[in-house]
Amino acid sequence: MTTAFQASIKYPLIWIINTANPSESEPSINKANKRIRKMVRFTDWLRAHYESAYHYYLAEHLHEYGIENGDIPNFLGLRVTEAKTLHISLYRKSWSEVYVDVIIRAYVDIFTGDESTPNRRKSIVDYRVRGYYDLYEKRCHLFQCFMPYRPEDDMDKLQLDDYLVPIISKNDLEDTVHWFLEEHYPYAFLNPGRINIKAMIRKMGLHVYKTGLSEDERINGVLYLKGKRTTLYADDGTSFSADIPDKTILIERNLCRDNPKKANHTALHECAHYGLHSLFFLFQATYIEELHQYFDPIDVDKLPLDDKGHKEITLMEWQAKRLTPRIQMPEEWVDEKMQELLPKYAWMNEFVMYEQIIKELAEYFNVSKEMAKYRLRELGYSDTRGVLNYINEAYIPAYKVPSEISPYQTFDISFDELVKIFRTDRKLRDILHTGDFIYCEGHLCLNTPPYIEIGNDHNPKLTDYAHEHMTECCILFTKQRILKYDYTAGVLQDTIPEQFQKAFISGTPAQKIRWTTFVKETKVKLPSNFTDIVAYYIENFGL
């Protein structure tokens, strides 16, 4: 076992086949990569366990298949002098089984001529060894098929990366929805409309229960692929231990009571994880079990998770979050419903029309208004970002968002966010020094006609003109949000992620010129001492 071979496999153990008894192999410490990590690649685990077996298998069986060089005159035999793994392709077979294609390059000596004085020439040929591995039953069927390598023989299945996470691009999401429903709930196509999530769960062979999942209710749902003893919480908040069966979804009970649509969404989110990522979590659980078998007791929670591991977790959450609304609202179903709703509300102005359409879609598909709005925007019907926005615990009036505004920019800002930015962003403080802006309807708007008027409740509100021309009167913010997801080996859970969010003023070129002028004019008028400045803020900005 060479140092280069050990270094190429990022796994703490390596199994070397016993050529005297090929059915046996013994593990040894991988001195070049003996560091134990929280997450590993399936391809490294596969090579650590079976690479020597693959190469032995090739050497022993190549003579049965030949080397596809046509008829070789006076052929006597061949011998494999070296084998090299070129590539491993992975495909989903089922929720627990992964297809494995290993492409191996064989360096071969071909013997021809007379047996007493044979001629030898060298040849290089590539082969494909195809099989599958059952991660739930831990059964190896890796050596099912042996064939010369041809790219056109690649499988037409859902392809997986080295960690067993599906390879899905943004452009593949709608097609993936069709695959998901055909694979797990084909009955959906018989009656397009509202997805029966309970029926889907049963069809997928899963079970669902509601219970208390955490003290702080940060965990919305959990999927246990394999049975496990865990801590749950009763109605009064007391903890208790329970044995969870295989393939079980648990939903936070308070979520079911307070927000049934969100509970349905969470259950479907776990179904999406099961359909897409069960192989990943089954394998990582297998890896942890193997660590406990061959190493001293280890605290899995304290093992390091590298950047690639974090990226895989984020990727899986992105896939589940992007796929779930598409499963609940497939593109063709939305198109069909929109053909009915658009003529119904065509007499309204655009953003008020879409406010009504979103409400009807949410009711029809049994989803939240936010999800219905999100799907319409994705499908290109209209920029619905200014419709049904929930700020300061209330829906704010609809407004038009110009097409040039990026997805990361917004006119909306909560009072709490505004206070945070006010403390840290000098540009905002300079703008507010002008006294020309008012905080109204979740926006910072110019406090002047034709943008602000007094409503029937004697409070200020944005005018219809302001709602149609937001870039003229309202400050534009850019928001950045970084999500950090929890990772527990072998468990899929929908956890409210830890969020790091900041917002800062951006604005269109015209706004920036106007704000710069305001700032210059106002700085001349500002008080010079701290006490007067505080009084100035209270009097002019209402903060």
Regions from the language model: what does each represent?
Residues 201, 320, 372:
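Divalent metal-coordination and catalytic microenvironments
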Residues 219-243, 287-303, 411-417, 422:
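Charged, glycine/proline-rich intrinsically disordered loops and linkers
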Residues 5, 11-20, 28-92, 97, ...:
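Pan-zinc metallopeptidase signature
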Residues 101-239:
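Contiguous, non-catalytic segments that form substrate-binding/exosite surfaces or channel walls
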